[in-house]
């Protein structure tokens, strides 16, 4: 079930895990991949997203903040996605003001 919905005329963004696919192997494989290749910013991003999908809010926030600090994490759309995932994790932890701040950062990162 989707969480809170924000509307802006002409804009819609939905990103939810595909419930038709088994995700049982994603997390252990991503954790292994990041241990083996800690400088692979793409897999760090995916690991943080997977923590979000699993409701592991603190792991999500920590991992995605690390992703944003990586010198190779330059793709602005992916950086903005990490910020949105951090925002959603903050929201789910009851930190609405922090969530708002992260959403605003995401908009600034990739305003298109």
Residue ranges of each PLM-predicted region?
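Short coil/turn linking the two alpha-helices of tandem helical-hairpin repeats
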Residues: 55, 72-75, 94
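Charged, long alpha-helical assembly modules
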Residues: 94-112
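Inward-facing hydrophobic residues that define packing positions of alpha-helical scaffold repeats
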Residues: 64-65, 103
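Catalytic-site signature of metal-activated, phosphate-bearing donor transferases
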Residues: 1-62
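Structural marker of alpha-solenoid helical repeat scaffolds
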Residues: 36, 70-74, 109
